[in-house]
Each structure stands twice: as C-alpha cells, then as structure tokens.
C-alpha cells in the first residue's frame, strides 16, 4: 500500500541549501546509504522538461532530462522534499516520474501503444497534493494493474496545471478503466477524468477522449 510506503520512513529534514539548477539540486539531497533501507518493488526515475524557452528548430522532447533514479523509500523522500514539487517550477515545465528504463516519450516501446488519464488542478496546493498521492501510490504498487502503468507527468502551466497518468496498452479498456477509477480514489477527485490514446494525440492535438470515469 502507498500509505505503508509513506509511513515506513518519515520524510527526512535536510539542511542542504536548495540549488536552482535541477541536477545540482538533486545532488544537494546528499542521499546516503542507511541501515535497513526500505527497497521498493522496482526502480523509478524522475525526469524534467522545460519548454518555456525552446531553441529554434529543436525537436519535441529535446529539452527532456533525466534527473535521478531511485529504489528506496529514503531516496524518494530526500528527492521529493528537496527538489521535486511541481509548484516550485516555472510555467511550461513538465515533471515526470516513470518506471526506470522507460522514457516519457510516445516513441518509447513501453509507451508507443498506450495512452493517458488526465486531471486538471485548481491550485498549486492541489497540484502538489495530487502529485504526492500519485507518487506514493506508484512506488507503493497500490494499483492492481501496476505493470500497465508507465508513469505520471505534472505539467505546470500559466493558466491551468494538470497531471497525466501514462499507461502501456490503450486498447485494454478493462485495465484502463480499473486504473482510472483507482486513480480518482487516490487523488480524491469527484469530477470526470478522461483517457486519450497517444496515437490519436499524434494525429490531432485536441484528441477526443476514448474512456472516462
């Protein structure tokens, strides 16, 4: 359970000064091996993408950067407390947590046939809360269809922030509906959320949703 993972080790209070650069900030976390680390079922990787100042002619995703891969609860809390809160980032920044070995791109073999559930956030505080609840659910293997999930993306925007939960097999409606219902429960959302296929999004920017819960 995600709650068990969260409770396993209290969030560490770090004295290291935050650095404005993402990689430097991750290093500032000063993660140290500890006695009796609480290992996760699988490794996870944080990614960062700032699209606020794209270079002319740059391909989509060219600013995507791998930030840190972790495999223990202790590492997770160090990283989250020190760096990885969406509200800390400027507009047009995308923040990702994906299974290690999977890149947050449509072209990745694990994502190519997938899609995403999307939810919008009414405030920065709400975004941070939903983000943290989702992270704990993922690393805590709280979803019955955990192997179907690639990761989650927090998109910080000027007008409206959003979270997107990426999955592997969009055509597997039963699995996607189960994931969608569970996610709504985890982030405590009552409004309808929608699921779109990556293939549809490639062809059409405002692709019509295929599923909703």
UniProtKB/Swiss-Prot annotation:
Modification comment: According to the redox status, the Cys-111-Cys-150 disulfide bridge may have a role in regulating protein function by affecting its ability to bind capped mRNA.
Short name of one Pfam family: IF4E
Chain segments carrying region Disordered: 1-37
Chief location: cytoplasm
Gene3D superfamilies hit by this protein: RNA Cap, Translation Initiation Factor Eif4e
Molecular function terms, GO-annotated: RNA 7-methylguanosine cap binding; translation initiation factor activity
Compartments in which it is found: Cytoplasm; Nucleus
Disruption phenotype: (Microbial infection) Increased resistance to plum pox virus (PPV) strain D.
Keyword Cytoplasm: yes
Tissue expression profile of the protein: Mostly expressed in leaves, flower buds, leaf buds and anthers, to a lower extent in roots, stems and green immature fruit, and, at low levels, in petals.
Protein keywords: Cytoplasm, Disulfide bond, Host-virus interaction, Initiation factor, Nucleus, Plant defense, Protein biosynthesis, RNA-binding, Translation regulation
Disulfide bonds: 111-150
GO terms for biological process, alphabetical: defense response to virus; regulation of translation
General function of this protein: Component of the protein complex eIF4F, which is involved in the recognition of the mRNA cap, ATP-dependent unwinding of 5'-terminal secondary structure and recruitment of mRNA to the ribosome. Recognizes and binds the 7-methylguanosine-containing mRNA cap during an early step in the initiation of protein synthesis and facilitates ribosome binding by inducing the unwinding of the mRNAs secondary structures. Key component of recessive resistance to potyviruses such as the plum pox virus (PPV) strain D. (Microbial infection) Susceptibility host factor required for viral infection by recruiting viral RNAs to the host ribosomal complex via an interaction with viral genome-linked protein (VPg).
Complex and partners: EIF4F is a multi-subunit complex, the composition of which varies with external and internal environmental conditions. It is composed of at least EIF4A, EIF4E and EIF4G. EIF4E is also known to interact with other partners. In higher plants two isoforms of EIF4F have been identified, named isoform EIF4F and isoform EIF(iso)4F. Isoform EIF4F has subunits p220 and p26, whereas isoform EIF(iso)4F has subunits p82 and p28.
Similarity section: Belongs to the eukaryotic initiation factor 4E family.
PANTHER family: EUKARYOTIC TRANSLATION INITIATION FACTOR 4E RELATED (PTHR11960), EUKARYOTIC TRANSLATION INITIATION FACTOR ISOFORM 4E-2 (PTHR11960:SF60)
Name of this protein: Eukaryotic translation initiation factor isoform 4E
Organism of provenance: Prunus domestica
Gene that produces this protein: eIF(iso)4E
